[in-house]
């Protein structure tokens, strides 16, 4: 049974957006979290290229655990980019310098992405940030930093979680995976404990 026409069209739009983002790179990278958006990009992207899934986080974090399960279940090529307190604070300090107009909370969403960019500096890095969950400012900052965000260029960036879920299930994602709850990037990577903001802006050292 075919999916609703809008889901079929959405998947085709995602395929085109990924092709543009990959830009002919033979081994692009996906900043992977195990969330719905990154699962959808992984499902589409690996059919079109030799996709590597890099997950940045603290050992034992939700994102790393989900990525390892995805590797076992779907045979994704998963690599871990380990983070610790010192690494997180170094990256956060750099983001403060590069993006002074963002709030501390907004910059915290970019820490795992910056970690993946630093691990894979010479190839296209994709991520699943969406306009619905993340502010326009965060998306623009991520793209200025070098991350490619295919879902921001589909449906004007206003892609709902339900649309992503329906598309992923249409492509074969099991229902149990489709029920994964949303995690913020800092929560999923397990780095929120290292990021403390005074008045919502300044990074404090523990």
Spell out what each predicted region is.
Residues 52, 122-126:
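Beta-sheet entry/capping signal
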Residues 1-27, 47-49, 170:
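RNA-binding accessory domains that recognize and position tRNA/RNA substrates
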Residues 24-25, 119-122:
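Glycine-rich phosphate-binding loop signature in dinucleotide/nucleotide-binding domains
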């Amino acid at each position: 049974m075919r999916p609703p026409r809008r889901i079929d069209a959405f998947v085709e739009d995602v395929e085109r957006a990924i092709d543009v983002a990959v830009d002919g790179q033979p081994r692009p990278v996906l900043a992977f979290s195990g969330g719905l958006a990154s699962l959808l990009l992984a499902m589409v992207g690996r059919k079109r290229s030799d996709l590597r899934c890099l997950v940045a986080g603290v050992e034992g974090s939700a994102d790393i655990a989900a990525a390892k399960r995805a590797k076992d279940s779907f045979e994704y090529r998963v690599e871990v980019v380990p983070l610790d307190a010192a690494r997180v604070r170094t990256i956060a300090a750099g983001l403060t310098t590069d993006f002074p107009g963002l709030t501390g909370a907004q910059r915290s969403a970019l820490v795992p992405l910056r970690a993946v960019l630093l691990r894979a500096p010479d190839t296209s890095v994709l991520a699943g940030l969406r306009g619905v969950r993340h502010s326009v400012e965060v998306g623009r900052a991520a793209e200025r930093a070098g991350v490619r965000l295919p879902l921001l260029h589909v449906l004007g960036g206003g892609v709902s979680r339900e649309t992503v879920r329906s598309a992923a299930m249409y492509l074969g994602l099991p229902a149990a995976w489709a029920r994964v709850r949303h995690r913020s990037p800092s929560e999923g990577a397990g780095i929120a404990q290292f990021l403390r903001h005074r008045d919502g802006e300044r990074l404090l050292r523990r």
